[in-house]
Amino acid sequence: MNIHEYQAKELLKSYGVAVLDGHVAWTGEEAAEAARKLPGPVYVVKSQIHAGGRGAGHFKDDPEGKGGVRLAKSPEEVAAAAEAMLGNTLVTKQTGPAGRVVRRVYVEAGCDIKRELYLSLLVDRAKSEIVIMASTEGGMEIEEVAEKHPEKILRVAVDPASGISGFHARRLGFGLGLDATQMKAFAKFVNAMYKAFVALDCAIVEINPLVVTGAGEVVALDAKVSFDDNALYRHPDLEKLRDEAEEDPKELEAAKHSLNYVALDGSIGCMVNGAGLAMATMDIIKLYGAEPANFLDVGGGATKERVTAAFKIILSDPNVEGILVNIFGGIMRCDVIAEGVVAAAREVSLSVPLVVRLEGTNVQLGKDILSKSGLPIIAADNLADAAQKIVAAVKEAA
């Protein structure tokens, strides 16, 4: 689960992470009032969407204009900047061409920036460690730094069993070229950030940029926090921070039915049981010249109702031109899948090609249900056959 910058900063501040003063606003008038509460004379107005690259982005109705992060020198300028953003669609590298509608802005005090750095914490699942990453290339996308200047990314690993120690921050600080005063502030910042990361069950905490001020202070100029969805049951208070308007409606609907769904950019909808088989299915679709429209794992204990819901979610994507159902029935019974597919196809008046490959428990019963349904369902014998048939059917229907 992702949250907005202002929410992330409020949480991190409660654990001792240094952030600038700021207030959220939903209107231009509220933004001006927020500015009056700050020291000035410089203010920063930031669009609040679940995506990075806001400053370098552009608004759909003004592609040549200013981005989603703007400087202002008076409450009146703050109000004008906020009104120019609110209700408009901001397009960044991370939003894709569709962009995101700005529904709130964050008004923050200006800052005397001497240096811009990068700092993040994430989980290394392969090694069961928490990795702290830092770089002198603050303000840039870390993926771009990793590609062009991998030597500029510093890493230290922390064993969760023993926790963070002073040498972790010192090693990074020396690598970043911090002086003694800055090192002390940096160590305090890293320790507070680690404490928040562990206590809140985060998947990632990213500060980009982390700035060193003229006075030697270390402050989070931006903040991104993402939580481990599997741990949210331990944090009911964090659920209140969810902004469903920033999430894919299809993914929200899938979550209600305990389905693992991720929207992609292709045209072939996929419904599979098991994450590994789902990824293999997406790979073979690409092998035969098409692109998957989604990742969808119905799980091992799916019911007819869940399968029907999964089918509807796939078809709610206007980019879907065909559907491939690939089921290996171990715990999952093929007849249950078949009943769900038939029920959903009838309910939504299926208008795109559908290929179904079934194997495993009750496979013959499942095939009988499909063949007797009277629906134009294309049967496949194996994964390669299924991928070839759905790609061919989509091309023929085009």
UniProtKB/Swiss-Prot annotation:
Transmembrane segments: none annotated. Succinyl-CoA synthetase functions in the citric acid cycle (TCA), coupling the hydrolysis of succinyl-CoA to the synthesis of either ATP or GTP and thus represents the only step of substrate-level phosphorylation in the TCA. The beta subunit provides nucleotide specificity of the enzyme and binds the substrate succinate, while the binding sites for coenzyme A and phosphate are found in the alpha subunit. The keyword S-adenosyl-L-methionine does not apply. Pfam families: ATP-grasp_2, Ligase_CoA. Belongs to the succinate/malate CoA ligase beta subunit family. One of its GO terms (molecular function) is succinate-CoA ligase (GDP-forming) activity. Mg(2+) binds at residues 208, 222. InterPro entries: ATP-grasp, ATP-grasp_succ-CoA_synth-type, ATP_grasp_subdomain_1, Succ-CoA_synthase_bsu_CS, SUCC_ACL_C, Succ_CoA_ligase-like_bsu, Succinyl-CoA_synth-like. Residues 9-253 form the ATP-grasp domain. One of its GO terms (cellular component) is cytosol. Its cofactor is Mg(2+). Heterotetramer of two alpha and two beta subunits. ATP binds at residues 46, 53-55, 108, 111, 116. It comes from Acidiphilium cryptum (strain JF-5). GO terms for biological process: succinyl-CoA metabolic process; tricarboxylic acid cycle. This is Succinate--CoA ligase [ADP-forming] subunit beta. It catalyses: succinate + ATP + CoA = succinyl-CoA + ADP + phosphate; GTP + succinate + CoA = succinyl-CoA + GDP + phosphate. Pathway: Carbohydrate metabolism; tricarboxylic acid cycle; succinate from succinyl-CoA (ligase route): step 1/1. Substrate binds at residues 273, 330-332. Its EC number is 6.2.1.5. Binds 1 Mg(2+) ion per subunit.
